[in-house]
Curated annotation (Swiss-Prot):
Post-translational modification: The disulfide bond which can form in the large chain dimeric partners within the hexadecamer appears to be associated with oxidative stress and protein turnover.
The protein's name in its UniProt record: Ribulose bisphosphate carboxylase large chain
Modified residues (N6-carboxylysine): 195
Residues where N6,N6,N6-trimethyllysine is found: 8
Family to which this protein belongs: Belongs to the RuBisCO large chain family. Type I subfamily.
Subcellular location: Plastid, Chloroplast
InterPro entries: RuBisCO, RuBisCo_large_chain_AS, RuBisCO_lsu_C, RuBisCO_lsu_C_sf, RuBisCO_lsu_fd_N, RuBisCO_lsu_N_sf, RuBisCO_lsuI
Residues of the active site: 169 (proton acceptor), 288 (proton acceptor)
Protein residues bound to Mg(2+): 195, 197-198
Sites marked Transition state stabilizer: 328
GO cellular component: chloroplast
Catalytic activities: 2 (2R)-3-phosphoglycerate + 2 H(+) = D-ribulose 1,5-bisphosphate + CO2 + H2O; D-ribulose 1,5-bisphosphate + O2 = 2-phosphoglycolate + (2R)-3-phosphoglycerate + 2 H(+)
Residues that coordinate or bind substrate: 117, 167, 171, 289, 321, 373
Amino acid sequence: TKASVGFKAGVKDYKLTYYTPDYETKDTDILAAFRVTPQPGVPPEEAGAAVAAESSTGTWTTVWTDGLTSLDRYKGRCYHIEPVVGEENQYIAYVAYPLDLFEEGSVTNMFTSIVGNVFGFKALRALRLEDLRIPPAYSKTFEGPPHGIQSERDKLNKYGRPLLGCTIKPKLGLSAKNYGRACYECLRGGLDFTKDDENVNSQPFMRWRDRFLFCAEALYKAQAETGEIKGHYLNATAGTCEEMIKRAVFARELGVPIVMHDYLTGGFTANTSLAHYCRDNGLLLHIHRAMHAVIDRQKYHGMHFRVLAKALRMSGGDHIHAGTVVGKLEGEREMTLGFVDLLRDDYIEKDRSRGIFFTQDWVSMPGVIPVASGGIHVWHMPALTEIFGDDSVLQFGGGTLGHPWGNAPGAVANRVALEACVQARNEGRDLAREGNEIIREASKWSPELAAACEIWKAIKFEFEPVDKLDIKK
């Protein structure tokens, strides 16, 4: 038996066991691409092997119990290392994990292994998980999004254009009745959705049950008047899973179409539970990514948002915030389009120019609609329509409620701008080049749009993104 072979105690280099450049990856392996910045004097192979070891079966010394199992079957393997272009002493280490290391249907367990203790490892100056390849053998153990893009369109009876939303502001401090009034005005004016802000849960100035009631009243009234299906993302995020489900149950009893969750602050376990409830009860699920920038904004350490996006698609959500490219929040265009495709499409080819390290095959898992939100207004509409296409939600908070004439005219301005852009695109016009002209033409017959154009004509948020794709300098 293995255990009787004689056990050699002591510390040995990780690379002797965990660096295997000849390894051929299996179709069932979970593959990870890490950006590794070793401490001075640590060779890249040792650093890459250390990552593979610490995120799978290894520990800092040889242990007697290694003899009781088959390390070859269970260990993570660093199978390829390449230097990062334009950076000194920085490498992409590719690690393959056998599928048996992970519990089925648990994003929580997957992340505990892959991005657990290893990120505090002393031999590395910094470590960032850039991408994951999730094999169908694993993704099939997840239910994924409660409904998906096509089911959502069918439920809402809205086709051939992006959907429009609005976050109700001021996000904290309104009473439930006034909050509901703002929802009604926006929906009545032509938006498809209004939204609870991510930090609206159940505070002293507005308890959740009151808000749910007044928002439901608002959307039914707007629905009756416009003949269109309306929704309000009721934020069910709570301090405990039980309380969260209680809120979702009440939303279902009110008959509303959609609820919302903050998936990173709420946690993947809670999120997956809520997604299962939503699927079983016909509720759409809108996901906000509050806290993501803590994890994904630094280029050299943490985890890229494309990994958080893949994890959300597995855990379950029908919408997720995904940057705007043009507004006030972080997001480089090619990189953003890369993870937008990872959210929506069935099959995404490896493409390093868009930050996609692996070909990802989701097989039949439903897609997630990306939400563009944050500092956008009517002048951005042509760019947003062109960048995100029809399967998206464009959310204008200040860009609706900041209209000089009030909320309903703000909603009218956004809807007119969107319909004008969609029509122009369908007629074959170039939105990137003629965008401003299209908006100007539409504003001639829409006084609401003209007023919006006037007030935001010079607003831009021009900063270089912190997290960029690697290119030769």
